[in-house]
């Protein structure tokens, strides 16, 4: 069985739109209005998008295509799970190569294909798309399948944030902090995070297509570099207003910026800890909102960053997620 457009749409989670263009399935996690507000190439990244279904087929054949969203990231992995166990990947970088500053190296892109043998009987398939670049599916075939049934979680987490929440610099989409948190809360992901972005009130003002059960907000490290403190506070307050208007009563976790090696420098927003203090001032003591100190979520060691500067590698995300989950499950 080769999955057709309607079948692929039915098994996709985390996407606002699925289209077949130029021989490829394109997945969008933003509405046209959201993409216009963000206005960044990373909106084409399918971060958090998954294809989840039950089937009785014996072999999964997957054909994919990848290209850079912008020049600085080209690593990727499609992670394939069978009954919640990693069965294989399509990736252009081995796990063993993920040492030092691997994030800024160029890796092969284009068309890739692979077959995955499946165990007998019914099984649940989960295909996680890359977060690091623009990725498409050209074809999915389930050999000897007599049916596919979409799988959806009862709960959903809506993520807002920058490149770290988008997933940089985990090679595997299943090992980002967003994926780890979603697994802990048994929820599907809607990821509205985009690298390089800051608190943007206009984005929060647009209600998500799916009403979430949880919300995660994680901005600040880019704001520190790009706006003054007064503007930062104004933007953060505007973002809060949008969240409270559209998602009143929804448990919301606001994460302050992670530790970074250059945190003692003075940037446009002043001292780095001005950001955390201001977020506590604006979001703290609000009903259904928990402010989480990002500075304490990871070891203060640049070796846990995939670029040795800012973006956690998979070890870094393990620390991040494990500590974050403790706050979210309180």
Which role does the model predict for each range below?
Residues 1-156, 329:
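N-terminal secretory targeting modules
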Residues 118-119, 125-211:
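Serine-esterase "nucleophile elbow" of acetyl-processing enzymes
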Residues 127, 216-218, 253:
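Structural motif
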Residues 169-173, 194, 227-230, 265-268:
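Short, solvent-exposed loop/turn segments at secondary-structure boundaries
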Residues 198-234, 242, 257-262:
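Oxyanion-hole/transition-state-stabilizing segment in secreted/luminal serine hydrolases
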Residues 231-238, 271-275:
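Charged helix-capping and loop-helix junction motifs
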Residues 247-252:
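A short helix->loop->beta-strand "cap" motif at the edges of active sites that frequently abuts
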Residues 260-330:
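Catalytic His-Asp segment of secreted/periplasmic serine-dependent ester chemistry enzymes
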């Amino acid at each position: 069985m080769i999955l057709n457009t309607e079948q692929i749409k039915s098994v996709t989670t985390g996407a606002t739109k699925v289209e077949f263009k130029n021989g490829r399935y394109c997945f969008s996690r933003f509405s046209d209005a959201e993409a216009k507000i963000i206005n960044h190439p990373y909106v084409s990244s399918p971060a958090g998008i998954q294809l989840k279904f039950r089937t009785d087929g014996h072999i999964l054949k997957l054909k994919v295509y990848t290209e850079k969203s912008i020049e600085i990231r080209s690593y990727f992995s499609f992670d394939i799970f069978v009954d919640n166990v990693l069965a294989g990947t399509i990736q252009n970088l081995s796990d063993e190569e993920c040492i030092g500053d691997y994030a800024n190296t160029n890796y092969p892109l284009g068309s890739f294909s692979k077959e995955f043998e499946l165990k007998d009987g019914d099984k649940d398939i989960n295909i996680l798309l890359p977060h690091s670049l623009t990725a498409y599916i050209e074809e999915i075939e389930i050999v000897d399948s007599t049916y596919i049934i979409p799988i959806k979680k009862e709960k959903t987490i809506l993520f807002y944030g920058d490149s770290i929440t988008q997933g940089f610099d985990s090679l595997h989409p299943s090992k980002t902090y967003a994926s780890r948190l979603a697994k802990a809360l048994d929820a599907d992901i809607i990821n509205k995070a985009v690298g390089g972005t800051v608190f943007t009130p206009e984005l929060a003002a647009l209600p998500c297509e799916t009403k979430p059960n949880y919300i995660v907000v994680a901005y600040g490290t880019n704001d520190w570099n790009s706006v003054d403190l007064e503007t930062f506070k104004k933007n953060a307050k505007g973002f809060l207003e949008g969240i409270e208007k559209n998602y009143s009563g929804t448990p919301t976790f606001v994460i302050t910026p992670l530790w970074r090696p250059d945190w003692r420098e003075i940037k446009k927003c002043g001292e780095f800890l001005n950001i955390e203090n201001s977020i506590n001032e604006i979001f703290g003591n609000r009903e259904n909102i928990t402010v989480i100190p990002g500075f304490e979520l990871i070891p203060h060691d640049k070796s846990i960053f995939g670029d040795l500067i800012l973006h956690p590698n998979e070890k870094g995300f393990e620390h991040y997620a494990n500590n974050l989950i403790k706050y979210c499950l309180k």
